[in-house]
């Protein structure tokens, strides 16, 4: 617990102790428009009532200073990566929960998409994999890995420890709102999982990868 609160504080949306800096700038010194240029955040999914086509949902909030051609190029690239092309003309309110989640993820990504906002520094996603099937989880994780490789700091709150080990560079493990482990994925072990999740696990290694499975 505490993941959503931590992300909210990192985004400058919730008060917290200490100081958060993005690119050397303190959040408290940034105006709301400047903060929106530096970071984007997707909160945990809540019901949305957009009775408009998906392409309009994606266009909401885009910088009008950007050319329509550049905006459309970014939207098309995201829709291809997240497999949203077939949904662009559909009414957002009639989509399934998983489809809506993918659209909202794409909308958040557009806020810090490199070709539209070179000043984007941080992407915060709270449970972005919720409601997505395995195929679309993998598509999203591949895209996020690509963006991280281009210099964007990507912070995810997820529950699946095996996905975190596979895809993360660093882990921050919380228990009751307190940090109990921070560092590389190699720090995850059976003792940590027993402490945080109160379960016994078995470590499985194959093909250079590691999984932790609940003991039967």
Give residue ranges: language-model regions.
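Helix-to-loop junction immediately C-terminal to a conserved catalytic motif
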Residues: 11
